[in-house]
């Protein structure tokens, strides 16, 4: 989805093509850095918030409810309270699944390090905390939006929760999902789960509907 893809039509054609791929995971990490155009200009970024929003809209148009994640820097030199609020409002409007938040760190030899208007660590911390709270809200809301959906889940490990054995994995959207341990599936298998509730914070669980891929041929023969 970079600028190299050219005009809107070509970007739309590209998104349509990846949406048709059966093995494509609908999880896209699109680094934003800031939702404020003034700050993006100071960062020498070659895109603006409207273009970024348009690309997010294309992904949602053709992939339904994909997981969109991003990176945001707070406290870049000369970032005013208004600039930060613009960035915050933009992040809120896109409604990312996850936002990785970084406080600007001055690095010797960079152009940004020589800029005036360096913010204090206390100012950066306040802005970071606000973004972190928004991120937590968005993550919970996205996970909740998946309740009732059928998720394809790769089982990654066996754990004990409240005295019971569970398999933990991630869906194609990278949502943490747990199912009770059973003999007909195991770690490294891919299953379909109907998400019904939260087992614990940020972990969905539900009914296993089918086995999509069994990792060991011998186990597959035994089950069949």
Where are these regions (language model features)?
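Terminal RNA-binding accessory module
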Residues: 114-211, 215
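Conserved beta-strand positions that form and line the central face of beta-propeller blades
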Residues: 39, 168, 222
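Single conserved hydrophobic/aromatic residue that forms the stacking wall/gate
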Residues: 1-9, 212-224
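OB-fold and OB-like beta-barrel modules that bind single-stranded nucleic acids
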Residues: 28-30, 99, 155, 194-195
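Conserved non-cysteine loop/helix-boundary elements of the Radical SAM core domain that shape
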Residues: 3-98, 104-123
């Amino acid at each position: 989805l970079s600028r190299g893809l050219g005009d809107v039509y070509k970007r739309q054609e590209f998104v349509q093509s990846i949406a048709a791929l059966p093995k494509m995971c609908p999880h896209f990490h699109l680094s934003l850095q800031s939702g404020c155009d003034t700050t993006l200009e100071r960062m020498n970024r070659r895109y603006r918030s409207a273009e970024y929003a348009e690309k997010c809209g294309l992904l949602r148009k053709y992939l339904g409810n994909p997981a969109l994640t991003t990176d945001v820097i707070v406290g870049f030199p000369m970032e005013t309270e208004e600039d930060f609020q613009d960035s915050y409002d933009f992040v809120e409007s896109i409604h990312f699944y996850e936002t990785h938040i970084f406080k600007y760190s001055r690095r010797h030899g960079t152009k940004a390090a020589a800029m005036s208007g360096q913010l204090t660590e206390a100012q950066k911390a306040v802005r970071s905390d606000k973004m972190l709270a928004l991120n937590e809200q968005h993550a919970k809301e996205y996970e909740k939006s998946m309740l009732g959906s059928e998720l394809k889940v790769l089982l990654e490990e066996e754990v004990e929760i409240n005295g019971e054995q569970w398999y933990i994995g991630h869906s194609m959207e990278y949502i943490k999902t747990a199912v009770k341990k059973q003999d007909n599936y195991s770690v490294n298998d891919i299953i379909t789960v109907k998400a019904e509730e939260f087992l614990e914070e940020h972990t969905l669980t539900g009914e296993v509907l089918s086995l999509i891929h069994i990792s060991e041929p011998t186990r597959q023969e035994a089950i069949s």
